[in-house]
A protein has these predicted regions:
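N-terminal export leaders
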Residues: 6-10
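C-terminal segment of classical bacterial N-terminal signal peptides
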Residues: 17-26
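C-terminal lobe and pocket-closing loops
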Residues: 129, 213-280, 309-312, 326
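An extracytoplasmic/periplasmic, membrane-proximal ligand-sensing/linker region
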Residues: 34-36, 177-178, 265-326
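N-terminal (or domain-start) structured segment
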Residues: 28-119, 157-158, 167-168, 180-204, ...
């Protein structure tokens, strides 16, 4: 009996000491955040995604009172950054700020994904939705999707189009399948790399990201024919959807903040609360609109369900776009 008492007292003493030092999980959770938060970006510094991550990191730092740094870990379609986060301590101090559509797609584009996005990550907060766009140069006589389709059917495999990422590839592939086209895909490293061929007319059209497409629209270089979202976007309200043009789809990229799945619920809810607060700010909503997106607010539970649906949807997208597994 004395031995049991001594053990009990020792355990109690350790627990009290740990709590006093801020070492117990419950205390650490209640204190969150009390150290620097790292937001992990899967794209290089200076990229469009990096601009979005850094913008929100600054805004969330202000409402949370936390010090937030952005770490860029590009490569393997986001898998390097994602794996880094899944292996990190589930305490809310390492946040994966990435496109949910990309991690969902990776589940089907890699033979052996390094992690299971649904099992290993929890969506803490969603931020925005961004469609891709069908664009032609302003010098093109084509002004509508109907005219583009008529032209492409006439040209057959003599016509080509430009893509530079997976979402653009999927958008164009769905369009080709729905319209029964033989147009040839030409892949570029970036939207900027394809500019000369698009402006010269060597490419019949481009399926590109909204940030680049809208910037070219504002500078008078592009004419936008359609967006891939189910509804028109605030940043280009006059541009119809692919569905309106006769090609039903709701294929969008969406940004989310994800944490390791074992992260305490209270911590996840704090991140969600900060993000909701930030998304309610007028300048933030304008930023999202200017980037070609629409604000996307959800609870962690709703975000996780959306992620599950995206994983299922991307199985079909990858098949339609004939994307080989890596």
């Amino acid at each position: 009996m004395p031995t049991v008492t001594r053990r009990f007292m020792l355990a109690a003493s350790v627990a009290v000491a740990g709590s006093a030092l801020g070492l117990s999980p419950a205390a650490a959770q209640a204190d969150y955040p009390n150290q620097t938060i790292s937001m992990i970006c899967a794209f290089p510094a200076g990229s469009g995604a990096d601009v979005i991550v850094r913008f929100f990191a600054e805004k969330i730092a202000k409402v949370s009172g936390a010090t937030i740094i952005v770490e860029n870990k590009p490569g393997a379609g986001g898998n390097i950054a994602g794996q880094y986060v899944t292996r990190s301590k589930p305490d809310g101090y390492t946040i994966f700020f990435h496109t949910g559509s990309a991690v969902a797609g990776n589940m089907h584009m890699f033979k052996t994904p390094p992690f299971d996005v649904v099992k290993d990550l929890q969506v803490a907060a969603t931020v925005n939705k961004q469609p891709h766009m069908i664009a032609v140069p302003v010098s093109s006589p084509i002004k509508t999707m109907k005219e583009l389709t008529e032209y492409l059917k006439k040209e057959g495999s003599n016509a080509s189009y430009a893509v530079n990422n997976t979402s653009g590839k999927v958008l164009a592939a769905i369009y080709k399948q729905e319209a029964g086209l033989e147009t040839v895909e030409v892949a570029y490293k970036s939207s900027a790399d394809s500019m000369n061929d698009i402006m010269s007319g060597a490419m019949a059209f481009a399926a590109q990201d909204p940030v680049f497409s809208l910037s070219q629209l504002r500078e008078g270089r592009y004419r936008l024919l359609a967006v891939s979202s189910a509804k028109r976007i605030p940043g280009a309200p006059d541009v119809p959807t692919m569905t309106e043009a006769g090609y039903p789809m709701d294929q969008v990229g969406w940004f989310a903040m994800m944490v390791p799945s074992a992260t305490p619920k209270d911590t996840v809810n704090k991140i969600n609360g900060w993000t909701r607060q930030v998304l309610g700010q007028e300048d933030v909503r304008k930023f999202v609109t200017d980037q070609g997106g629409d604000v996307f607010v959800s609870t962690p539970e709703e975000g996780q369900e959306y992620l599950k649906k995206e994983v299922a949807a991307w199985a079909g997208y990858v098949k339609v776009a004939n994307i080989p597994q890596q």
